Amino acid sequence: MRALIQRVKHASVSVDGHDVGAIEHGVLAYIGLGHDDNLQSAQRMVDKILTYRIFENDDDPAKYGKLDKNVQQVDGGLLLVSQFTLMAKTDKGRRPDFGGAMAPDAAQDLFAQLIAYAKTQHVDVATGQFGADMQVLSVNDGPLNFLLEVP
């Protein structure tokens, strides 16, 4: 499982011109699911995203400006967007190979479980719409982007 996380000032997802999810200050997370992923790896990924320290600590003068706080500590939102293209193999040729991505039906079920778990761990969780042609708008804060992986 892979996640591309971005610290954002705000982010939103729309489908067919209708907003389906939005957050203010927080983390936009694109989630890619692979063949071997399961509920346990999904829970590990959510835990990692929620505790990954990508926000500055402006409260402690000794840590001022250092990335020392996570999204929960800054009361930020979490926007989860399914993104099978994160599982692409790009090391050969000029066309991505999506063979490593989980099959759509299984991925939809696992992504729904990932969302449900995230909502038990964090107050402000929004999502895109699985399998839809989504338009994602965000204002990247920093910019700060990190590629996270869990087995």
From Swiss-Prot:
GO MF annotation list: D-tyrosyl-tRNA(Tyr) deacylase activity; Gly-tRNA(Ala) deacylase activity; Ser(Gly)-tRNA(Ala) hydrolase activity; tRNA binding
Q: What class of enzyme is it?
A: hydrolase
Which of UniProt's keywords are assigned here? Cytoplasm, Hydrolase, RNA-binding, tRNA-binding
Please name the InterPro entries in this protein's record.
Daa-tRNA_deacyls_DTD, DTD-like_sf
- Give one GO biological process term: D-amino acid catabolic process
GO CC, any one term: cytoplasm
Signal sequence, start to end? none
Q: So what does this thing catalyse?
A: glycyl-tRNA(Ala) + H2O = tRNA(Ala) + glycine + H(+); a D-aminoacyl-tRNA + H2O = a tRNA + a D-alpha-amino acid + H(+)
Entry keyword annotation includes tRNA-binding: yes
Q: What is its EC number?
A: 3.1.1.96
Q: Which intervals of this chain are the motif Gly-cisPro motif, important for rejection of L-amino acids?
A: 142-143
Among Gene3D superfamilies, the record links this protein to:
D-tyrosyl-tRNA(Tyr) deacylase
Subcellular localization, as worded in the UniProt entry? Cytoplasm
| Ranges in a coiled coil | none
The record's comment about this protein's domains reads:
A Gly-cisPro motif from one monomer fits into the active site of the other monomer to allow specific chiral rejection of L-amino acids.
How is the subunit organization of this protein annotated in UniProt?
Answer: Homodimer.
Family named by the database record: Belongs to the DTD family.
This one is known as D-aminoacyl-tRNA deacylase
Q: Which species is this record about?
A: Psychrobacter arcticus (strain DSM 17307 / VKM B-2377 / 273-4)
